[in-house]
Amino acid sequence: MDNGLFIVVTIFVVNILYVTIYTVRLLLTMKGYRYLAALSSVFEMIIYVVALSLVLDNLNNIANVLAYAIGFGVGVIVGMKIEERIALGYITVNVITKEYNLDLPNQIRDLGYGVTSWIASGRDGERMMLEILTQRKNERKLYKQIIEIDNGAFIVSSEPKQIHGGFWIKQVRK
């Protein structure tokens, strides 16, 4: 590999690393993991300085600038994929059943989730409203389980800002 191609590849890879760490650090900061975010920012800055100095020292080659820019975009995607895998934090899942079903909360509790339920009125009559707080890593699995029980359920999830008190199930059954 000649020196020019080596620099292009190095800039590309280093910028992917930099932006991946940057993206994860930003998400850690937003989730309140301040010490982990601070530690990752140290590595982020070291990698950033290396990547930027490589580009600035070799500005005469447009391929270096393109490698930097493309590496940046790829780094954002990689960082988001990593964050999806880590799935930090909790979500609140609100479920409105298609029909009133008193047994539905118990079926979901039997799967290992904590459920609060109440009667709701919809256009076509009574429904059941459920609120479930769970770890984000369980979101897709919970959606599938709810749909298996009530295929017509309306499901919405959101991230709570703070959590205090309440009833917690220790672990969702695999």
Swiss-Prot record:
Keywords: Cell membrane, Membrane, Transmembrane, Transmembrane helix. The chain crosses the membrane at residues 4-24, 36-56, 62-82. The keyword Disulfide bond does not apply. InterPro entries: DUF2179, DUF5698, UPF0316. It is a multi-pass membrane protein. The keyword Cell inner membrane does not apply. Its main location: membrane. It is found in: Cell membrane. Belongs to the UPF0316 family. This is UPF0316 protein lwe1794.
